[in-house]
Curated annotation (Swiss-Prot):
The keyword rRNA processing does not apply. This is Dynein regulatory complex protein 1. Its main location: cytoplasm. One of its GO terms (cellular component) is cytosol. It is found in: Cytoplasm, Cytoskeleton, Cilium axoneme; Cytoplasm, Cytoskeleton, Flagellum axoneme.
Length: 754
């Protein structure tokens, strides 16, 4: 700590400290802050020395680097050193007040410890002496009880009163001394507060002076640094300007040299072109001579071919004569075959009679089987109606039971949440947030998986419609065509299938056609389409939707291919139809995937996925919506052409994809299990453990409260007994017998107050 005289000099002559040498803090100083500062400066000096060694500088400052340091760098270093010294001096000047205050506080605490120790010793001595006096007084009470003469008893009481007064006087004297000491400490505390306020004012004044001096020196050094940078900038501008002029001169010389070299290269290229022309002329003459020789050789070969032609003509005449002889032999063989044919005709007539008999028998069997088939079909339809009815009833019952159990579970979960809220807010004092679980917002059973229908089921829904099932057929039609485009109706699809059935009869076996004759029209169409689709390889619902869309887009592709070229009409139409089929297969796959994931995905994501596939055809579908929906544009002669293109295009995507198997209309029990398990675990194990710990603590708290209640009851009973005893004592003291006594009992002790 610096003396007060040096502090005044530092306040008045702040700028002189920059030039005068400053004695740094010492490690051997008595001040701990000064020792800490000395260690920090020593560590900083070591780090600076390591940095200089890493940069290749020398510690003694005598040897610098090969390149001379710039003026700006020198000015920055000088300013940094000056400002560092100024800040160190200012910090020391400001912290002197704090150091002096700390020393005063240390001395005060030492004195306070000493006075406290003396006070405690004095109090202990006082306690011992007062205890001895009190013991002496209590021992004399026993002697007073043994005395029977009132005069001696009165003297003893006077002595006891004197001793008690002396004891009380000693206690009062001690209390007055402690109060006087407390008053002195209060005065000392007021003086310390005044001294601290004076130190704070001095500290603030010094800090303001230091801030002003530091600001002044910072501005001055900043001006010096700016001047150094400006002079260095001017020097750099002059040197760079000279370098730029030298670079321009070198660039001009290089450009001149480049022009000379370019002229030389142009002359060399002209010479090479002349040599190339001469070589091409010579090569042309040699090729011409070679081709003339080839022509002569070909003429010789032509003469040889004529000679061989003459020879072959003679051979053919000879063969003609041989064939004539063979024809005569064949006439003889024909007559023999005619006789054999007549014999076979007789056998054929016999077989026809047998065949007619068999046909009649088969027709009778067919009629009986057809009647049985119709009866079974009606029974099957009735069974389907009953199954649908029971499915709807079961679904309604399942939904009612689900909702009832779900409401009960959610009510229990809400009660658990209320209990958790009370525990958090009242017992734990923590904020409670309403949990947001996904299963709490669910109402009703989880949706069934979508079921993909087979081609036969769709054909039954389309063709086997009766007038008695008006509402049911409409519902089934809507369900079966849920994935078709919006512009395609069930009526249009039925017309396309009928047209396909009429024009593709060659794909059906003749035996099957003969068996289908006695059936009804709708059943006949159904079986014929089943055979056609099995021949074409159409097995799934997606393939049927592709074919319908393919037929509807045929006219647009037909017109576009006709405008391109008339000569290549068939090839262009075939390629356009195949490409359209491939594009539609991709569209149908994306549509099926999007419809299968509607219940799990986001509608916006589905639109984004379908947008990339359907974007190219969206404009044309909106314009041609009315044209595509009508099957009148499809000519019967074009049906086979469309089928050919569709089957060729269907082979590629069908080879790559796996065979889709029909799934039963089952529920996803895993989702149901997960849902009910989640409802059962609305309160996690961590909170349940917290509840168990809280329950144990509340049980302990209940035991403590019961014990306190018992103690309070005992206290009330004791108070009641005490009041009864006081009333009895009061009656005893107020009795008339006590007035006749020379020393009444009221003089020996005081009555307790209620």
């Amino acid at each position: 700590m610096n003396p007060s005289g040096s502090i005044g000099v530092l306040e008045q002559n702040g700028e002189e400290h920059l030039a005068a040498p400053i004695l740094g803090p010492s490690v051997n100083s008595d001040n701990p802050q000064e020792r800490i500062q000395a260690r920090r400066l020593r560590i900083a000096a070591r780090q600076e020395a390591r940095r200089r060694e890493a940069l290749g500088e020398y510690l003694d400052g005598k040897k610098e680097s090969e390149e001379e340091q710039s003026k700006s760098y020198k000015q920055k270093e000088e300013s940094r050193l000056k400002l560092t010294k100024l800040l160190l001096c200012g910090t020391e000047l400001v912290t002197n007040i704090q150091v002096a205050a700390d020393i005063r506080e240390i001395h005060r605490r030492v004195e306070e410890e000493e006075t406290k120790r003396q006070r405690l010793e004095k109090l202990e001595n006082e306690v011992k002496t007062s205890q001895d006096k009190f013991d002496e007084i209590t021992s004399k009470w026993e002697e007073g009880r043994q005395k029977r003469i009132p005069q001696e008893l009165w003297e003893m009481l006077n002595n006891q009163q004197v001793h008690c007064a002396g004891l009380v006087e000693d206690k009062n004297k001690l209390i007055s001394e402690l109060q006087q000491e407390l008053k002195i400490k209060d005065d000392q505390y007021v003086k310390d507060l005044k001294k601290q306020s004076e130190d704070i004012t001095v500290l603030l004044e010094r800090m303001e002076e230091q801030v002003k001096s530091v600001m002044k020196n910072f501005r001055q050094e900043l001006n010096y640094i700016e001047k150094a940078f400006e002079s260095e900038r001017q020097e750099l501008l002059t040197t760079n300007k000279k370098k730029w002029e030298r670079a321009l001169q070198a660039h001009n010389a290089k450009e001149l040299e480049y022009l000379i070299n370019r002229m030389k290269r142009v002359e060399d290229y002209e010479k090479q072109l002349n040599r190339q022309r001469v070589w091409d002329c010579e090569e042309y003459n040699s090729i011409k001579i070679k081709l003339e020789q080839d022509v002569q050789i070909l003429e010789q070969q032509l003469q040889q071919m004529k000679a061989t032609y003459q020879l072959n003509q003679e051979k053919l005449e000879y063969n003609f004569q041989v064939l004539k002889k063979r024809d005569e032999e064949s006439t003889v063989i024909k007559s023999q075959q005619k006789r054999k044919l007549n014999r076979l005709h007789d056998i054929l007539n016999n077989l026809r009679t047998k065949y007619s008999k068999q046909i009649k028998q088969f027709q009778e069997d067919n009629q009986s089987l057809t009647s049985d088939y119709k009866r079974l079909v009606t029974q099957f339809k009735d069974l389907q109606k009953a199954i649908r009815h029971f499915i709807i009833i079961d679904q309604d019952k399942f939904r009612e039971i689900w909702l009832m159990n779900e409401a009960e579970a959610k009510e229990l979960a809400q009660r658990a949440f209320d209990v958790d809220k009370i525990i958090h807010s009242q017992h734990l004092g923590l904020p409670w947030k309403i949990p947001n679980f996904w299963f709490l917002n669910n109402v009703g059973p989880i949706s069934l998986q979508q079921q993909q229908k087979s081609v036969t089921q769709i054909l039954e829904e389309l063709l086997l419609q009766s007038e008695d099932e008006g509402t049911e057929t409409a519902m089934s039609e809507d369900e079966s065509y849920m994935d078709l485009p919006n512009q395609v109706s069930a009526k249009t699809t039925k017309k396309i299938l009928v047209l396909l059935c009429d024009e593709s009869g060659f794909l059906i076996e003749s035996k099957l056609l003969s068996l289908l004759l006695p059936l009804e029209k709708s059943e006949c169409y159904l079986l014929r389409l089943d055979a056609i689709f099995s021949a074409l390889g159409i097995e799934s619902e997606d393939d049927l939707y592709k074919m319908v869309n393919f037929f509807l887009r045929f006219k647009a592709h037909h017109l576009s291919s006709a405008q391109v070229s008339i000569s290549t009409h068939s090839n262009a139409e075939r390629t356009s139809l195949v490409s359209a089929l491939q594009h539609m297969s991709l569209m149908s796959q994306t549509d099926r995937r999007s419809s299968a994931s509607k219940s799990d995905g986001d509608p916006t994501e589905l639109e984004d996925q379908q947008g990339s596939d359907n974007g190219s055809l969206m404009g044309r579908e909106l314009v041609e919506q009315e044209d595509l929906s009508s099957p009148m544009f499809i000519h019967p002669n074009d049906v086979l052409k469309i089928l050919d293109a569709f089957v060729t295009g269907l082979k590629k995507p069908k080879d790559a994809r796996p065979v889709q198997r029909l799934k039963k209309d089952t529920r996803n029990n895993l989702k149901d299990t997960e849902y009910w398990e989640s409802l059962a675990m609305v309160i996690p194990f961590s909170k349940q453990n917290l509840w168990d710990a809280l329950f144990k603590a509340l049980e302990k708290y209940y035991l403590v409260l019961t014990q306190r209640a018992k103690l309070l009851m005992e206290n009330d009973s004791l108070e009641q007994q005490n009041a009864e005893m006081q009333s009895l004592l009061q009656q005893y003291l107020q009795a008339k017998v006590n007035l006749e006594l020379q020393v009444p009992p009221t003089q020996g002790f005081r009555m307790p107050s209620k």
